C-alpha cells in the first residue's frame, strides 16, 4: 500500500513522539490491514520508535493512565497509578454551521474547534487553577488538551464526571440570576468560588456560551487511550501536532500547514465516488472514475477517507 510506505518513511526520518513517562504507559496500534493490538509496553521512546518503523501502524495510541505493569493484559493487574486529565474537542460534537455541513477537515470547522479549545483553557486556568501540560491538534477536526498536575492524576471516574458537568454547565439555570422589578428584568451576578463571574454573565445572556463542548466519555475514562502526540492520524495523514497555547492564538491555517507532513510531490488518484467540496486548502470537483494529479498530502487524505485510490 503506497500510503503505508509514506507513513514508514516519515517515521524513519522525522518521527518525534511527545510522551511523558513512556515506561508507565500502555500502547495500542491499529494497522492498515485491520485489527488493533493493545497492552504493549516500551521502556524508552527509542524502543517505541523502532517498533513503529518496523510495523508501521495506521494509528498509534497511548493510555492516559500510568501503570506499574502497562504490558499486562488483565486490567486489574496493571497496577493503576493515576491518569492524566484529557479533554477532546472535536468538530463532530460542535453544533456549528461549518462543522455540520461537512465531516471532512475544513478550515472553518477547525476555527470553531479552536475557539472552543481556547474557551476550555481559559476556564481551566482562570476558574480551576489547572495548567495544561500539553495542547495537541488531533490531526483531524479538533484538539486534545492534557492536564498532568499531581492533584488531578488520582481523580476517579466519579470526580471526573463532576468536572465534566461543571464544564458543560449541567444544571445551570440562567433564571437564578434574573429577577423582575416592575416591568423590567434585572440581572444579578454573584461572584462564586473559582472566579467564574464572567462565564456566568455570558451564560445568562446566552446559555450556549457557558457550555464547553468536550467529549465527556474521554474525560471521565481513567483508562482512556489517546492518540500519541507526534504520530500521524490514520484518518487524514496529518500530524497529531503538539502546540503551545500561543499557537492557539494564531490562524488555524498555520496549524494545519505545520501538520502536513507529506508536502513533496504529487500522486495520481482515481475517485471511487463523485465528490465536490472543500478539503483542507483545496476545492475538489470530481466524478466517479475521474483521475486527478493532486498534491501528495491531499491524495493521501482522500484515500484514507475512502474517496479515491492512489495508483502508479
Curated annotation (Swiss-Prot):
It comes from the Archaea. Transmembrane segments: none annotated. One of its GO terms (biological process) is DNA replication, synthesis of primer. GO terms for cellular component: DNA-directed RNA polymerase complex; primosome complex. Keywords: DNA replication, DNA-directed RNA polymerase, Magnesium, Manganese, Metal-binding, Nucleotidyltransferase, Primosome, Transcription, Transferase. The keyword Manganese applies. The active site is at 88, 90, 215. Its cofactor is Mg(2+); Mn(2+). GO terms for molecular function: DNA-directed RNA polymerase activity; metal ion binding. Its EC number is 2.7.7.-. InterPro entries: DNA_primase_S, DNA_primase_ssu_euk/arc, DNA_primase_ssu_PriS. The keyword Coiled coil does not apply. HAMAP family: DNA_primase_sml_arc. Belongs to the eukaryotic-type primase small subunit family. NCBIfam families: primase_sml (TIGR00335). Heterodimer of a small subunit (PriS) and a large subunit (PriL). Catalytic subunit of DNA primase, an RNA polymerase that catalyzes the synthesis of short RNA molecules used as primers for DNA polymerase during DNA replication. The small subunit contains the primase catalytic core and has DNA synthesis activity on its own. Binding to the large subunit stabilizes and modulates the activity, increasing the rate of DNA synthesis while decreasing the length of the DNA fragments, and conferring RNA synthesis capability. The DNA polymerase activity may enable DNA primase to also catalyze primer extension after primer synthesis. May also play a role in DNA repair. This is DNA primase small subunit PriS. The gene is priS.
Amino acid at each position: 500500500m503506497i500510503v503505508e510506505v509514506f507513513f514508514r518513511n516519515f517515521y524513519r526520518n522525522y518521527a518525534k513522539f511527545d510522551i511523558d513517562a513512556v515506561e508507565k504507559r500502555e500502547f495500542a496500534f491499529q494497522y492498515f490491514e485491520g485489527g488493533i493490538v493493545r497492552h504493549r509496553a516500551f521502556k524508552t521512546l527509542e524502543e517505541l520508535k523502532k517498533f513503529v518503523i518496523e510495523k508501521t501502524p495506521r494509528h498509534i495510541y497511548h493510555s492516559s493512565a500510568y501503570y506499574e505493569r502497562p504490558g499486562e493484559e488483565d486490567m486489574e493487574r496493571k497496577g493503576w497509578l493515576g491518569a492524566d486529565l484529557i479533554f477532546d474537542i472535536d468538530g463532530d460534537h460542535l453544533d456549528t454551521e461549518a462543522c455540520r455541513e461537512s465531516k471532512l477537515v475544513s478550515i472553518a470547522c477547525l476555527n470553531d474547534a479552536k475557539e472552543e479549545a481556547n474557551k476550555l483553557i481559559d476556564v481551566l486556568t482562570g476558574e480551576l487553577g489547572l495548567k495544561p501540560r500539553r495542547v495537541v491538534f488531533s490531526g483531524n477536526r479538533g484538539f486534545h488538551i492534557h492536564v498532568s498536575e499531581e492533584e488531578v492524576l488520582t481523580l476517579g471516574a466519579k470526580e471526573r464526571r463532576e468536572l465534566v458537568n461543571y464544564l458543560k454547565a449541567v444544571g445551570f439555570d440562567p433564571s437564578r440570576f434574573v429577577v423582575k422589578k416592575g416591568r423590567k428584568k434585572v440581572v444579578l451576578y454573584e461572584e462564586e468560588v473559582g472566579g467564574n463571574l464572567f462565564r456566568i454573565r455570558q451564560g445568562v445572556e446566552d446559555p450556549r456560551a457557558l457550555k464547553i463542548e468536550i467529549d465527556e466519555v474521554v474525560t471521565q475514562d481513567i483508562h482512556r487511550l489517546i492518540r500519541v502526540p507526534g504520530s500521524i492520524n490514520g484518518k487524514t495523514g496529518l500530524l497529531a501536532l503538539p502546540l503551545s497555547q500561543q499557537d492557539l492564538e494564531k490562524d488555524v491555517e498555520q496549524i494545519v500547514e505545520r501538520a502536513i507532513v507529506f508536502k513533496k510531490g504529487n500522486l495520481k488518484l482515481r475517485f471511487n465516488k463523485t465528490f465536490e467540496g472543500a478539503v483542507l486548502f483545496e476545492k475538489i470537483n470530481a466524478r466517479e472514475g475521474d483521475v486527478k494529479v493532486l498534491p501528495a498530502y491531499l491524495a493521501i487524505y482522500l484515500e484514507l477517507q475512502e474517496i479515491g485510490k492512489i495508483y502508479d
